[in-house]
Amino acid sequence: MKRILSVDDSASIRQMVGFTLRNAGYEVAEAVDGQDGLAKAEGSRFDLVITDLNMPNMDGLQLIEALRKQPGYTFVPILMLTTESQAEKKDAGRKAGATGWIVKPFSADQLIAVAKKLIK
C-alpha cells in the first residue's frame, strides 16, 4: 500500500485529506506542522508528502527544503496544499523542491487525481 504524509496545522484539513486518501486506498500519516512532519518523515518512508505552506514552528517551504536534504526524499513527490495562489509563492515552492501545488479549497476528486498522477 502506498503511504502518504499529510502535514497541516488545521485538524479539519488533515481529517479531510486523510479521509479522502484512505478511501482511495492509501495509507495516510498525519503531522501538525513542519517539525512534526520532518520527524515522522525521518522515521519512516512515504511515497508522497502533502504539506500546507503557512504553519507554526516550521512552514511548508522549510519542511520541503529539509526533506530534499534527506537521501530518501530526494525524488519523493511533495505537493503543496495551501490557500496561497500567488505566482511568487508558487515559484518559492518550486525552488524549495515542491513537485506540485493545489489551492484550497479543493475537491476530493482533484486531490485523488493528483495523488494518482504523482505516485507511480
Annotate each PLM feature:
Residues 52, 82:
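Active-site residues of response regulator receiver
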Residues 25-32, 40:
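Short hydrophobic/Thr-rich beta-strand motif most characteristic of the beta2 strand and flanking loop
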Residues 44-50:
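Active-site beta3 strand of CheY-like receiver
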Residues 15-23:
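Charged docking surfaces used in two-component/phosphorelay signaling
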